UniProtKB/Swiss-Prot annotation:
Its EC number is 3.4.23.36. It is found in: Cell inner membrane. The gene is lspA. It catalyses: Release of signal peptides from bacterial membrane prolipoproteins. Hydrolyzes -Xaa-Yaa-Zaa-|-(S,diacylglyceryl)Cys-, in which Xaa is hydrophobic (preferably Leu), and Yaa (Ala or Ser) and Zaa (Gly or Ala) have small, neutral side chains. InterPro entries: Peptidase_A8 (IPR001872). It comes from the Bacteria. This is Lipoprotein signal peptidase. It comes from Shewanella pealeana (strain ATCC 700345 / ANG-SQ1).
């Protein structure tokens, strides 16, 4: 474990701040400029559409009656704390894992603020093909998905990267 935070993954916490600010500023812009369900087409397959998500990804548990708000709040806080502890234990040079953890934390905190402030998450990125729409999402959701993808990728390539840096042939 690194002896000070500058040598640890906490050095990457600027990504958390960047994701959080981009997410919150974009949602504030949507709330200030759109009515609920208002939509503006930007591309033939992409709209800005203001929707409220009372559940999790893909509106999971959105009609559960309200208790899910507190479950998702607890999960967001728990994962953010856990990943922050892991960041402190990681060397700063482990860029892929540090980037992944900070993307997930930034996204989790962005959606957490929405849940606490509004009781729902503001979603507005609406991709579709013909009449089939992918569930709307936001910058926080994107960061969480990219972070999760990097964690999965790291699980496949981390051992190979270690062997390369140690000069070991497979």
């Amino acid at each position: 474990m690194p002896t000070n935070w500058k040598d640890s993954g906490l050095r990457w916490y600027w990504v958390v701040v960047l994701v959080f600010l981009a997410d919150q500023l974009s949602k504030q812009w949507v709330l200030s400029n759109f009515d609920l369900y208002e939509s503006i087409q930007l591309l033939p397959v992409f709209n800005f559409t203001y929707v409220r998500n009372y559940g999790a990804a893909f509106s999971f548990l959105s009609d559960a009656g309200g208790w899910q708000r507190w479950l998702f709040t607890f999960v967001a806080v728990g994962f953010s704390v856990l990943l922050s502890v892991w960041l402190r234990q990681q060397p700063s040079k482990m860029w892929r894992l540090n980037l992944a953890y900070t993307l997930v934390i930034g996204g989790a905190l962005g959606n957490l603020i929405d849940r606490l402030q509004h009781g729902y998450v503001v979603d507005f990125l609406d991709f579709y093909w013909n009449t089939s729409h992918f569930p709307a999402f936001n910058i926080a959701d994107s960061a969480i998905c990219v972070g999760a993808g990097l964690i999965i990728l790291d699980s496949f390539v981390a051992g190979k990267d270690d062997k390369k840096s140690d000069g070991i042939k497979e």
